[in-house]
Every structure is written in structure tokens, then in C-alpha cells.
UniProtKB/Swiss-Prot annotation:
The lineage of its organism: Eukaryota, Metazoa, Chordata, Craniata, Vertebrata. The modification Phosphoserine is found at residues 21, 179, 490, 521. Residues 91-167, 358-402 form a coiled coil. It comes from the Eukaryota. Disulfide bonds: none annotated. This is Protein hinderin. Residues 254-263, 449-468 have a biased composition (Basic and acidic residues). The keyword Coiled coil applies.
Length: 577
């Protein structure tokens, strides 16, 4: 090993020494450099040109040891220098190729470390994203489980509802089959009844339908022929069909002791106007016998034999109205219409027996007919409301036209009055003397005042009679004040002529409404009504009294069955419509 003398020994020269430690030390292995061609001896690498660096500490140690051990000899000096040289080897001793290889290796290591960091970061991000996705999938799985449970619950509920609906359908089907069987039985019974009608016709002479509380459908309300619309024709047809299948209670006013003896259902009102003939009975006999079978509890009354309705004013034929055989003088021995004796009529009602099935069937038919009648009335109500709206619009237009014509007439009247005043004043000045001028002025003023009063009275009458404005009467009443001044009595006459026309139209309207209501409500409580007569005079309103009607209503409420109460409820609905 080469040793370099320090500054303490300037005379010392470099020398080579061989130590046993050189053989013991192994060859240095550097990756990428240690190959067969790259292995060199240590002696070649050691050049005497001083590429070797010595540290200051080593040099000082070597100098101290040299100073302390001067007498020991060269052997110790060589050993110390060789040890320092072995420890001071560096990379500068390598060749350029080795240095390049080492630099490339360092760059590769740096790049690999950077890639490692990038891949680690990427793996961490991917791991986090995967964890998020896993959490989302778990949440979705939980939601799916909950939805599945809810759907299972709904499925169970739907199954329960389906089972209930199937039960309901089965019950309805059973009810339908039962109703069909009942209808078939009812039809068979109707056929049997129709076959029995022929056998009962022989006894129908003794048992007239008027003996019961059944009004004749074709003569119950016979109105005079009036112009009717198609709606009224259909309503009248439905009313006739309805009357054929229902009992018609009619109010009759009796003394109080007679009302206590007789059921309210059997009372009839039979009145006759003096100048009117009775109508011919046209009711069919088997239908009345059928009603007699249905209603055996109704006690027959003699007055019902003659209960034949009359004409349009609701003025009726009046036979005596005593109910019991205690008054034989007030009624003839036989009825002039049905030609039957009272004995046969009194004793013939107990022969018929009640038929429960026919009662039920007829009550059902009545209910159906009442419901149909109610529907028809609702339709008619809508139509009438529509027509009423149209009539109201027409009435408003007519009122506007009338108001305009009144304004025009007032203007014309004022102009005529002004012209007449001027003409009369000039004529008076010409034909009369000057001393009478004051009196003429007074007369002019009074005449003008009377003319204005007459015009105002005429317009007030026209306001009252808006339904039928009479322009001819107004122009006829207005006269020339100069020739014939109108007295105050003419104003009263004009007002009275206008008011009865209004009363007549309103009474006609109320009478038609009351007749319609009474025809639609056969089982409803009878109400006091007035029947004005055009030919025989006014009807006596005092004949109908409320006190016996209240007692009859109480009796009717006590003897009614649930079926009759239900019919009355439907009839009240129809009456309300």
C-alpha cells in the first residue's frame, strides 16, 4: 500500500508495503460493475499520482504515532499507513462508464420511487371509490329489502280485499238469484190473478171500484182542454199510469163525530157546481177488484160509490156525504152511476180475503213507479228551469222595450200638451171677453193638472199589469181634456180592471200547480185547496177546515205500515221537487 508522508516528515518518501490484511479483505461488489471484465486488482487502482485522499484525522494520528514511535522501525510505520489507505477509498477512483452506470441506476431508483408513490396514491383512490360503491350497494340492498317487505304486505292486503270482494260478489249473486226467483213467482201470481179476473167479473157488478177508496183514473182530475206542450203531455201520460196503480186519498169535510167513525183513507170530496153535468165513469172493473183484494182493511163508505171526479176547475159532483146508514134520507137507495143497491155494497166487502204476496208485489211496483216518477220529475224540473231562464231573459227584454216606449210616450205627451195649451190659450183669447180672462187661466191650469194626473195613473196601471200590457186600453182611456175631462172614478175603474186580470192569471197558475202536486202525492196529507170556477162563480174557501184534517192525519199516521211510510218518504221527495 502506498503511504504519503505528512507535513511532519517532509523528508519521508512514499513507499509500498505489503500487509496480511490485504489478502483477508474481500473484493468490493458493486451492482452493474462487478463482472468478469471489470474486476481489477487493487494494485492497479493505486497510482502514485496522489489520487488518494487522506483525512486530517488520520494524518494527525499517523504523525503522532510516528513521533511517539520513532525508534520502532519502518515496519510499524508501514502498517499504519496501509490501514489509513484502505479506509480512504472513494467513487472518484471509478472510471467514467461506472460512474454513468451508477448515475443511471440512481435515476432509475428515483423514477421507480416516484412511480411507486403514484401507484400507491392511485390504489388508495381506487380503494376509497370501491368502498363508496360497496356502501351504496349495501344501502340499495337495504332499500330493496324494505320495498320487498312493503310489496309483500300490499300483496297480502290485496289478497284479503280480493277475498272480501269475492264474498260480496257471491252474496250479491245469491240476492240476484233470489230476486229473480221472486220475480218469476210474482209473474206466475200475476198470471193466476189475470186468470181469476175472468171469474171475478160476474161479482164485479156488486163490487164497484168506487166502493173502495180508489179514485177513477180517467175521471179523477179531468181538466178542460188547454194548449199543452210536449213536456206536459208526457207528464200527463206518466200521471195517468201512476194513478192506475196507486190509491188516491181525497179530502172530505165531515162533522167531527163522523170523522171519528170513518178512517181517513176512505174520505172523498164530492161537490157539484150547479151548472155542470157529471162525467161518465170509465174505470175498468177488474183493476178495482184487485185493489179491493189488496186493501180489505178499508171500510166501505156509501159516498165512495158516487166518487166520480169532474172537470178542469176541480168542481165536483156532490152527493150527500153521510158515512153511516143512520142517515138513509140523504142518499137514494141506489147510485145513479154504478146502479148498485146500498145493501149489496155494504155487505159485499167482507167476502174477499187478503193476499199477502199481492200486497208485497204491488208495494214493490209502487216503489218502482214512484222512483221512476221522481226521476221524470227531476228531468222535468231541469227543463222547466231552462225554460224559466229563457222566459226571464225575454221578460227583461220586454221590460226594457216597455221602458223605452214609456219614455218615448212621455216625450210625445209633453209635446202634445204644450201644443194643446198654446192652441187653447189662443182660442180663449179670441172668443172670450177680457173680464173673464182670470177665470180662463184658472180653468187652463186645472185642465192641465188633470191631464198630467191621468197620464201618471195610466203609467201606474201599466206597471202593475206587466204580464199583459194593454196599450189599446191606455190610448182608449186617454181623452182630450178640453172636450171630455176624465173623472176620478175612471182611474179606479182602470185599476180594478187591471188587478182582476192579474188575480185570474195567478189563480190559474196556482190551481194548476196544486192539481199537479195532489196528483203526484196520493198518500200525502190532504191540504186545503181552492178550486175556482169560471162558470159557476168562486169556490167557498171556508168548506175546507184544518181541524178535521189534523185528526185525519193523526189517524193515518197510526194505521200506516213501514211500506206505506217508505212510500210516503218517496212521495215527499217528489213533492219537494
Amino acid at each position: 500500500m502506498a503511504d504519503v508522508a505528512g507535513p511532519s516528515r517532509p523528508s519521508a518518501a512514499a513507499f509500498w508495503s505489503r500487509d496480511f490484511s490485504d489478502e483477508e479483505q474481500s473484493v468490493v461488489y458493486v451492482p452493474g460493475i462487478s463482472a468478469e471484465g471489470n474486476v481489477r486488482s487493487r494494485h492497479k487502482l493505486m497510482s502514485p499520482k496522489a489520487d488518494v485522499k487522506l483525512k486530517t484525522s488520520r494524518v494527525t494520528d499517523a504523525s503522532i504515532s510516528m513521533e511517539s514511535l520513532k525508534g520502532t522501525g519502518d515496519s510499524v510505520d508501514e502498517q499504519n499507513s496501509c490501514r489509513g489507505e484502505i479506509k480512504s477509498a472513494s467513487l472518484k477512483d471509478l472510471c467514467l462508464e461506472d460512474k454513468r452506470r451508477i448515475a443511471n441506476l440512481i435515476k432509475e431508483l428515483a423514477r421507480v420511487s416516484e412511480e411507486k408513490e403514484v401507484t400507491e396514491e392511485r390504489l388508495k383512490a381506487e380503494q376509497e371509490s370501491f368502498e363508496k360503491k360497496i356502501r351504496q350497494l349495501e344501502e340499495q340492498n337495504e332499500l330493496i329489502i324494505k320495498e320487498r317487505e312493503a310489496l309483500q304486505l300490499q300483496y297480502r292486503e290485496c289478497q284479503e280485499l280480493l277475498s272480501l270482494y269475492q264474498k260480496y260478489l257471491s252474496e250479491q249473486q245469491e240476492k240476484l238469484t233470489m230476486s229473480l226467483s221472486e220475480l218469476g213467482a210474482a209473474r206466475m201470481q200475476e198470471q193466476q190473478v189475470s186468470s181469476r179476473k175472468s171469474t171475478l167479473q160476474c161479482s164485479s157488478v156488486e163490487l164497484d171500484g168506487s166502493y173502495l177508496s180508489i179514485a177513477r183514473p180517467q175521471t179523477y182530475y179531468q181538466t178542460k182542454q188547454r194548449p199543452k206542450s210536449a213536456v206536459q203531455d208526457s207528464a200527463s201520460e206518466s200521471l195517468i199510469a201512476f194513478r192506475n196503480n196507486s190509491l188516491k186519498p181525497v179530502t172530505l169535510h165531515h162533522p167531527k163525530d163522523d170523522l171519528d167513525k170513518i178512517p181517513s183513507e176512505t174520505t172523498t170530496c164530492n161537490c157539484e157546481s150547479p151548472g155542470r153535468k157529471p162525467a161518465v165513469p170509465t174505470e175498468k172493473m177488474p183493476q178495482e177488484e184487485l185493489h179491493m183484494k189488496e186493501c180489505p182493511h178499508l171500510k166501505p163508505t156509501p159516498s165512495q160509490c158516487c166518487g166520480h171526479r169532474l172537470a178542469a176547475d176541480r168542481v165536483h159532483d156532490s152527493h150527500p156525504t153521510n158515512m153511516t146508514p143512520q142517515h138513509p134520507k140523504t142518499h137514494p137507495e141506489s147510485c145513479s152511476y154504478c146502479r148498485l143497491s146500498w145493501a149489496s155494497l155494504v155487505h159485499g166487502g167482507g167476502a174477499l180475503q187478503p193476499i199477502e204476496t199481492l200486497k208485497k208485489q204491488i208495494s214493490e211496483d209502487r216503489k218502482q213507479q214512484l222512483m221512476l216518477q221522481k226521476m221524470e220529475l227531476e228531468i222535468e224540473k231541469e227543463r222547466l228551469q231552462h225554460l224559466l231562464a229563457q222566459q226571464e231573459t225575454k221578460l227583461l227584454l220586454k221590460q226594457q222595450q216597455l221602458h223605452q216606449s214609456r219614455l218615448d210616450y212621455n216625450c210625445l205627451l209633453k209635446s202634445n200638451c204644450d201644443g194643446w195649451l198654446l192652441g187653447t190659450s189662443s182660442s180663449i183669447k179670441k172668443h172670450q171677453d177680457p173680464p173673464n180672462s182670470g177665470e180662463n187661466r184658472k180653468e187652463r191650469k186645472t185642465v192641465g193638472f188633470h191631464s198630467h194626473m191621468k197620464d201618471d195613473a195610466q203609467w201606474s196601471c201599466q206597471k202593475k199589469d206587466t204580464c199583459r200590457p194593454q196599450r189599446g186600453t191606455v190610448t182608449g182611456v186617454r181623452k182630450d181634456a178640453s172636450t171630455s175631462p176624465m173623472p176620478t172614478g175612471s182611474l179606479k175603474d182602470f185599476v180594478t180592471t187591471a188587478s182582476p186580470s192579474l188575480q185570474h192569471t195567478t189563480s190559474r197558475y196556482e190551481t194548476s200547480l196544486l192539481d199537479l202536486v195532489q196528483s203526484l202525492s196520493p198518500n200525502s196529507a190532504p191540504k186545503p185547496q181552492r178550486y175556482p170556477s169560471r162558470e159557476a162563480g168562486a169556490w167557498n174557501h171556508g168548506t175546507f177546515r184544518l181541524s178535521p184534517l189534523k185528526s185525519t192525519r193523526k189517524k193515518m199516521g197510526m194505521h200506516r205500515t213501514p211500506e206505506e211510510l217508505e212510500e210516503n218518504q218517496i212521495l215527499e221527495d217528489i213533492f219537494f221537487i
